[in-house]
């Protein structure tokens, strides 16, 4: 995992209310204080902004400026997703490990496996 993601994960942990994060002084601590709905709302907003930036970039002919806007919005989305992970006591490593688990497994195989597991769990 990149050092940047690791450091960001550490900052997020330090902003938790239990670790002394102050909602009056820290945007991250304020999100933690507001809870799940506030964090999820931000993720929804950032996901929508990412979609719009991507559509705009394609319409603009993938100029450097438009591509930069996509990167900017994806960074916001990643950031707020990492806030959610931290809020749920998960880390970027948990996501990296899941991606590693999926490596070499086609999307179609993954989908079929999930369907099979769901049927097994339902007792079918």
Curated annotation (Swiss-Prot):
Pathway: Amino-acid biosynthesis; L-histidine biosynthesis; L-histidine from 5-phospho-alpha-D-ribose 1-diphosphate: step 2/9. The lineage of its organism: Bacteria, Pseudomonadati, Pseudomonadota, Betaproteobacteria, Burkholderiales. Keywords: Amino-acid biosynthesis, ATP-binding, Cytoplasm, Histidine biosynthesis, Hydrolase, Nucleotide-binding. Pfam families: PRA-PH (PF01503). Signal peptide: none annotated. GO terms for molecular function: ATP binding; phosphoribosyl-ATP diphosphatase activity. This is Phosphoribosyl-ATP pyrophosphatase. GO terms for biological process: L-histidine biosynthetic process. GO terms for cellular component: cytoplasm.
């Amino acid at each position: 995992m990149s050092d940047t993601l690791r450091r960001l994960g550490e900052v997020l942990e330090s902003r938790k209310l239990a670790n002394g994060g102050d909602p009056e002084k820290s945007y991250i601590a304020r999100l933690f204080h507001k809870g799940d709905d506030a964090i999820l709302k931000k993720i929804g907003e950032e996901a929508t902004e990412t979609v719009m930036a991507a559509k705009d970039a394609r319409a603009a002919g993938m100029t450097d400026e438009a591509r930069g806007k996509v990167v900017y919005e994806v960074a916001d989305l990643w950031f707020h997703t990492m806030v959610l992970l931290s809020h749920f006591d998960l880390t970027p490593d948990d996501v990296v490990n899941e991606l590693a688990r999926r490596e070499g497994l086609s999307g179609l195989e993954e989908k079929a496996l999930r369907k099979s597991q769901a049927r097994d769990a339902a007792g079918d």
